[in-house]
Amino acid sequence: MFEAEVNPSGINRAELVVSIPSYNEADSIAYPTQQASEGLSQYFPGISSVIINCDNHSQDNTRQAFLNTPTQVPKMYISTPPGVKGKGNNFRNLFRKATELGAKAIVVVDADLKSITPEWIKHLGEPLFNDFSFVAPLYVRHKFDGTITNG
């Protein structure tokens, strides 16, 4: 179901995947991408990881904005075909790719978050490597970051 897949680093295995679902988020995707990279580098240095942008065939250069964001962690872009939209389709692609990569854990953050910090990656990812199967955040958030819960 991938219309497009861009894998500049040739990643074929990753224990930890951070996914950023998107649709027309070129203006905002860089910040959560940078924060995810910092979190992975700082808190999971010994674990193979990748940041995947699961996109809905955005027309606003989301792909380029994501891939051009400087990170220490490899990135991968996958997209649905034209006309196939919705976060559910992004998640379907994410689970398919994470399975192909042999991922042991997946962390998902939204593309338009402004309050995300590297610690989010730590707090969402660490329990998954300590016998927890699911982690949901409980936090005070900025009033405009509601899209993480209003998908």
PLM feature segments, named:
Residues 102-114:
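Short beta-strand-to-loop acidic/aromatic patch adjacent to the donor-nucleotide binding site
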Residues 49, 104, 133:
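Conserved acidic residues
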Residues 7-8, 37-47, 70-74, 97-102:
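Alpha-helix termini
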Residues 57, 80-87:
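Short, acidic/glycine-rich phosphate-metal binding loop used to engage nucleotide
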Residues 83, 89-93, 97-98, 116-151:
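Acceptor/aglycone-binding surface of glycosyltransferases and processive sugar-polymer synthases
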Residues 55-64:
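A conserved acidic beta->alpha catalytic loop
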Residues 2-7, 25-41:
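Short, well-formed alpha-helical segments that are part of the catalytic scaffolds
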Residues 15-17, 50:
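Cell-envelope/extracellular polymer assembly enzymes that use nucleotide-activated donors
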